[in-house]
Swiss-Prot record:
GO cellular component, one term: cytoplasm
Application of this enzyme or protein: Loline alkaloids show broad-spectrum anti-insect activity, and different lolines may have different biological activities. In vitro tests of NFL, NAL, NML, and semisynthetic loline derivatives with long carbon-chain acylations on the 1-amine have shown that many are effective against both fall armyworm larvae and European corn borer larvae, but the effects seem to differ depending on the modifications. N-Formylloline reduces the weight gain of fall armyworms by deterring feeding, and does not significantly affect corn borers.
Enzyme Commission designation: 4.1.1.-
Gene Ontology terms, MF aspect: ornithine decarboxylase activity
Keywords from the UniProt entry: Alkaloid metabolism, Decarboxylase, Lyase, Pyridoxal phosphate, S-nitrosylation
Residue numbers of N6-(pyridoxal phosphate)lysine PTMs: 62
Protein family according to the UniProt entry: Belongs to the Orn/Lys/Arg decarboxylase class-II family.
Binding site for pyridoxal 5'-phosphate: 194, 231, 266-269, 381
Gene of this entry: lolD2
Active site (record annotation): 351
Cofactor(s) needed by this chain: pyridoxal 5'-phosphate
InterPro entries: Ala_racemase/Decarboxylase_C, De-COase2_C, De-COase2_N, Orn/DAP/Arg_de-COase, Orn_de-COase, PLP-binding_barrel
Protein name: Amino acid decarboxylase lolD2
Residues the UniProt record annotates as site (Stacks against the aromatic ring of pyridoxal phosphate and stabilizes reaction intermediates): 190
Length: 415
């Protein structure tokens, strides 16, 4: 974590707490807030283009609706993977052209097809006969992309059970595209983020999409778009990229050689996760909670939870551990306290007994009511998953650290 990120947190905590007085604590001073280092987005983009120079990232908008993040990626040259009309409208509202959008949801309402046709969004994904016939009826000139089944058995949240055409269906779907006199722009797959690196899932997906291309050419179609999907994380990207490059060169040798292959990908978490840090406030502390089993005796209750920015704890059982404690505007890094700090559990703000962020962690110094806990890697599937359960709202404040200047001189933009 850079010094400028830490200073942004410390300065904001000092600011909001300075507005309070004895007996009068402003609600705004207790709201969780983010710090977003947009320079990290630019670094990620550069790393992507170095590892996969011929692959254009189409950012998976579902992972984050943050407008400043999206604008930064647009400036870098990204396209955008949208799965709903609302996501499409978000991208267009930022002045980004429709030609930079791919509509990737394989099963769509008719109204969304009408919107795409009106706006000129041409790349549309499908994975079954019914969807293709719906496209033919409502948007016959669409540039269709056949999504094939591709999954990794180690995935925490596998998508293959929901979307993707099986190999046995390739031939029939390709022939139906030809019969309906439609265009097959290409093929795609999606291997969701996995708990272990299985680059073989991407290689399988590339081989299957190459088979779609081959069958399409046999019936007189001319696909040119290969979409290698998403699922990339900081810990897996380089290994996946190392497997993807030779697989594309092998399976699409003629297309690559003739310069007629357009390659896309749909990274979301890779770009949206690490730039964002979240600070939550400790609103209550309970000690001697020994009657609840083997958990630590101290419970800390925070002003956030699984129905707000920690939904991934509920969806994929992700563990969240604070990177720092801020007390009276002073930062206390937690790297040295993982083994010798105070044992405690962290609980969310709702009345749901499942709203537990971490059942056993160690923090130091001893955390008090009013302290702040800072979590890193909080940009993906956080604000987009917020609910109003128990009446709690999540109008989170974000402090943006702008890219393009030296970190030591970069000024935070407070919005």
């Amino acid at each position: 974590m850079t010094t400028v990120v830490r200073e942004a947190f410390e300065n904001h905590v000092k600011l909001v707490e300075s507005r309070n007085s004895p007996g009068h604590v402003l609600a705004s001073s207790e709201a969780s807030f983010f710090v977003a280092d947009l320079n990290d987005v630019v670094r990620k983009w550069a790393a992507w283009k170095e590892a996969l120079p011929d692959v254009t990232p189409f950012f998976a908008v579902k992972s984050s609706y943050d407008r400043r993040l999206i604008q930064t990626l647009a400036t870098c040259g990204a396209g955008f993977d949208c799965a709903s009309t609302e996501e499409i409208e978000l991208i267009l509202s930022l002045g980004i052209g429709a030609e930079r959008i791919i509509f990737t949801h394989p099963c769509k309402p008719v109204s969304s097809l009408g919107l795409c046709r009106k706006l000129g969004i041409t790349l549309i994904t499908f994975d079954n006969e019914c969807e293709l016939r719906k496209l033919h009826h409502h948007y016959p000139e669409a540039q269709t992309v056949l999504r094939v089944f591709a999954d990794d058995p180690t995935n925490a949240d596998p998508l293959g059970t929901k979307f993707g055409a099986a190999r046995d269906d390739f031939d029939g779907l390709v022939r139906l595209v030809k019969e309906l006199n439609m265009q097959l722009a290409g093929a795609s797959f999606h291997a969701a983020p996995s708990v272990a690196v299985d680059a073989a899932a991407y290689v399988r997906g590339i081989r299957d999409t190459a088979e779609v291309f081959a069958r399409a050419r046999q019936v007189g179609l001319n696909p040119t778009v290969l979409d290698i999907g998403g699922g990339y994380t900081d810990s897996t990207f380089q290994q996946i990229a190392g497997a993807v490059r030779p697989a594309i060169a092998e399976c699409f040798k003629s297309e690559v050689g003739e310069g007629r292959l357009r390659i896309l990908a749909e990274p979301g978490t890779l770009f949206s996760c690490s730039p964002f840090y979240l600070a939550v406030k400790v609103v209550a502390r309970r000690v001697n909670a020994t009657a609840f089993g083997h958990e630590p005796a101290t419970r800390l209750y925070i002003n956030d939870g699984i129905y707000s920015n920690f939904m991934m704890r509920f969806i994929v059982n992700m563990t969240f551990s604070p990177a720092a404690v801020i007390r009276e505007g002073v930062w206390h890094d937690q790297a040295d306290h993982t083994m010798r700090g105070e044992a405690c559990s962290l609980w969310g703000r709702s009345c749901d007994s499942n709203d537990c962020i971490n059942r056993d962690c160690r923090l130091g110094p001893e955390v008090r009511v009013g302290d702040w806990l800072v979590f890193k890697d909080m940009g993906a599937y956080t604000t987009v998953c917020n609910t109003t359960f128990n009446g709690f709202t999540s109008s989170n404040h974000t402090i943006y650290l702008e890219p393009g200047t030296h970190p030591s001189r970069r000024s935070p933009v407070d919005l």
